[in-house]
Amino acid sequence: MILDSVFSIGNILPSAIQIGVVFLLGCVGEIIIEKSGNLNLGIPGVMCFGATGGALGCSIAMKIIGEGDPNYLLVVFFGLFFCLLFGAIAGLIYSFLTVTLHSNQTVVGLALTIFGGGFANFLMNIIDQSKLSVASKLIKAKLPFADSLGVFGDIVFGHGILVYLALGIAIAAFIVLKTT
């Protein structure tokens, strides 16, 4: 009986969608990179850089704003900005090594993956993680009417804004790649 509630569709599908969004964003980026003629095996490392940058940005924003009644939306946008910044820096490292220095794309990509994972592990031990749950609660906020629709509402509308943003990015990338 306990396993029935754990392995129900209403529990598995929303979690699978939220986890799958991470892979969706990485795959969209890799498809665009491959269309340009490069093979970037360092996408997981770039994603680690971005995630670490997002956590660092949220931590810095919480320290700047203070303990009072912070503007959580500002914290999330600060985290997203740092996430994009760190991901762009990792992409610039990859492009400098492969395009400018003509290094092997496979070797550089795998090295970036290993370095990104190690960088994330190192920096996440330094960051004060006690305040990061505030930003994650706002990112995971559901649409208000999702609970009234039952299981269907949880599966389709029970996700944070970044899930829908990622789906929009994937659809936009599909349209751009298909029509150009």
What are these regions (language model features)?
Residues 148-180:
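Alpha-helical transmembrane segments of multi-pass integral membrane proteins
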Residues 1-26, 35, 39, 53, ...:
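Membrane-interfacial amphipathic/re-entrant helices at transmembrane-helix boundaries
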Residues 65-70, 129-143, 160-165, 170:
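Juxtamembrane/interfacial segments around transmembrane helices
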Residues 34-53, 99-112:
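Short, non-helical or kinked segments that cap or interrupt transmembrane helices
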Residues 117-154:
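Extracellular/periplasmic helix-loop junction at the C-terminal end of a transmembrane helix
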Residues 32, 56, 60, 64, ...:
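Membrane-interface helix caps of multi-pass small-molecule transporters
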Residues 67-119:
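Alpha-helical transmembrane segments within multi-pass membrane transporters and channels
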Residues 18, 22-30, 46, 50-54, ...:
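Alpha-helical transmembrane segments in multi-pass membrane proteins
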